């Protein structure tokens, strides 16, 4: 039996519509599958680390990874709790994220542990001693593992030189830090060794939580002429309490990060945290675009800043040498 031409045409059109619809659905499904999941884990909220995160997100956008379009960021904060950092990292692995950006040493260590035996790439930032923290074996070559990142070895010796230059009656320096943070311990050991080699005495005041920072500061009153705090997440998260004790007793505070200087510390030679985040994003983008994380060599942070807070110094009667002011990259009035 011959099918009338009109019926044949209708049947052909129907087949085309069904086929086209199927292809459209398949194309839509493929597009959805291209949305990458990136876990972002930050150990604690404070301005310096928030700048790391902001720099990362801004640079990821410049690299072509737009949140909600081709990538979805799952941003988590462990609120200074190592156990929560581990839980967050484990959840990222369970969610089968495509990559993890870890901000700070504790978060990076948790991510490294959680991703063992997987191929999930981890990029770390805001880590002072990546080798000492057990994240990588060498700074000079690609890791050959799923982990790489930006290490920001603090210029501790230069920071101590700055303390010596700015505090004329310096004899003893107080060091406040969390002994549970590997990066802090590394920097404190360097500071202690350098200060003692120059003939100065060191008074340590370790803490286990941010609640102990004020008491640690109080314990140094009358015993030191200056206090130094490295890039320590625990101590910096309680900066206001620390500053109150030191300012009331006319003791200058020197820190390892620039954001703390903006908040009331006297001075630092610190890392540019925003640029650190951007640098980490560029590394992660390379991995997402096809490079293996184990073939991406760890990088040292690119930018450092000498920052002085004139108002903070004036409040405690500390006169800043003209030689220091003249070479400052940024002065807070």
Q: What are the residue ranges of the model-derived segments?
A:
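Short hydrophobic alpha-helices and adjacent helix-cap/hinge residues
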Residues: 2-11, 23-333
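C-terminal motif of bacterial Sec signal peptides marking the signal peptidase cleavage site
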Residues: 18-22
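Hydrophobic helical h-region of N-terminal Sec-dependent signal peptides
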Residues: 12-16
């Amino acid at each position: 039996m011959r099918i009338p031409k009109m019926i044949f045409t209708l049947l052909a059109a129907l087949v085309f519509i069904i086929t086209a619809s199927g292809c459209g659905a398949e194309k839509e499904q493929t597009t959805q599958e291209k949305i990458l999941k990136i876990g972002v884990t930050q150990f604690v909220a404070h301005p310096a680390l928030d700048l790391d995160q902001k720099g990362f997100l801004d640079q990821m956008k410049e690299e072509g990874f737009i949140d909600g379009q081709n990538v979805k960021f799952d941003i988590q904060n462990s609120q200074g709790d190592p156990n929560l950092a581990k839980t967050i990292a484990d959840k990222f692995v369970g969610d089968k994220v495509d990559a993890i950006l870890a901000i700070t040493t504790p978060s990076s260590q948790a991510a490294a542990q959680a991703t063992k035996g997987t191929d999930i790439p981890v990029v770390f930032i805001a880590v002072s001693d990546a080798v000492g923290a057990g994240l990588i074996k060498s700074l000079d070559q690609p890791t050959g593992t799923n982990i790489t990142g930006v290490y920001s070895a603090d210029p501790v010796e230069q920071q101590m030189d700055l303390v010596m230059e700015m505090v004329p009656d310096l004899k003893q320096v107080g060091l406040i830090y969390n002994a549970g943070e590997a990066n802090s311990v590394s920097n404190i050991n360097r500071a202690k060794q350098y200060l003692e080699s120059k003939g100065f005495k060191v008074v340590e005041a370790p803490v286990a939580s941010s609640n102990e920072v004020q008491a640690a500061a109080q314990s140094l009153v009358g015993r030191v002429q200056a206090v130094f705090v490295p890039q320590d997440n625990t101590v910096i998260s309680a900066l206001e309490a620390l500053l109150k004790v030191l300012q009331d007793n006319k003791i200058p505070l020197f820190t390892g990060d620039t954001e703390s200087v903006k908040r009331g510390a006297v001075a630092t030679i610190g890392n540019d945290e925003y640029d650190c985040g951007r640098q980490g994003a560029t590394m992660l983008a390379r991995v997402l675009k096809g490079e293996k994380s184990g073939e991406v060599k760890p990088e040292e942070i690119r930018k450092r800043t000498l920052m002085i807070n004139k108002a903070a110094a004036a409040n405690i009667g500390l006169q800043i040498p003209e030689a220091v002011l003249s070479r400052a990259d940024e002065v807070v009035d």
